[in-house]
């Protein structure tokens, strides 16, 4: 039983690289479990024994079930959150460096331990707004492969790095997206 539960949790985590993916995955799980989706902008007709959920902004979800015995008034409430420390890509996403490299213009979100993001392959996932006709629609995206890296500087460029580094998110934590184009003689054969 525990192995199956652990497998389900790991599967959920794998399918949920962002809070938007987590909400979409939870909504699908609730629908499969017989929950009815409600829209916030409509009046709700709730019934005894009904199971319901609603989402807001694609980033939050509330689910509830109504008991059959409504004479016994009580609530059991459990809550959690699906967002976590992350970097959000800004609207003007590309920052080009002097050497032709490209960094992503990001903003840190949440209480993060900055050093843990350094020197490890990272991917990109989340929500984008796409124009379809005369309207914009929300789409989930996940590249599911390593695309960016937030590099530490070499020790000879910052001898005090091991004495406590104070990171500037807008300078030190911008993900490197591309090393730029190589000229014909920029590599060894």
Predicted regions and their residues:
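N-terminal hydrophobic/helix-forming segments and targeting peptides
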Residues: 1-189
């Amino acid at each position: 039983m525990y192995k199956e539960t652990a497998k389900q949790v790991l599967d959920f985590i794998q399918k949920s690289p962002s809070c938007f993916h987590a909400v979409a995955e939870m909504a699908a799980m609730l629908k499969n479990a017989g929950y009815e989706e409600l829209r916030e902008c409509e009046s709700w007709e709730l019934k005894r024994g009904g199971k319901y959920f609603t989402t807001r902004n694609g980033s939050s979800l509330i689910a509830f079930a109504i008991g059959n015995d409504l004479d016994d008034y009580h609530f059991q409430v459990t809550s959690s959150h699906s967002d976590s420390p992350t970097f959000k890509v800004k609207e003007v996403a590309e920052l080009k460096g002097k050497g032709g490299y490209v960094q992503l213009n990001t903003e840190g979100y949440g209480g993060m331990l900055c050093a843990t993001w350094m020197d490890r392959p990272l991917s990109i996932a989340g929500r984008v707004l796409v124009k379809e006709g005369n309207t914009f629609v929300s789409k989930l995206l996940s590249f599911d492969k390593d695309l960016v890296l937030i590099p530490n500087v070499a020790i000879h460029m910052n001898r005090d790095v091991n004495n406590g580094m104070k990171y500037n998110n807008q300078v030190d934590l911008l993900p490197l997206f591309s090393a730029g184009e190589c000229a014909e003689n920029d590599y060894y054969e």
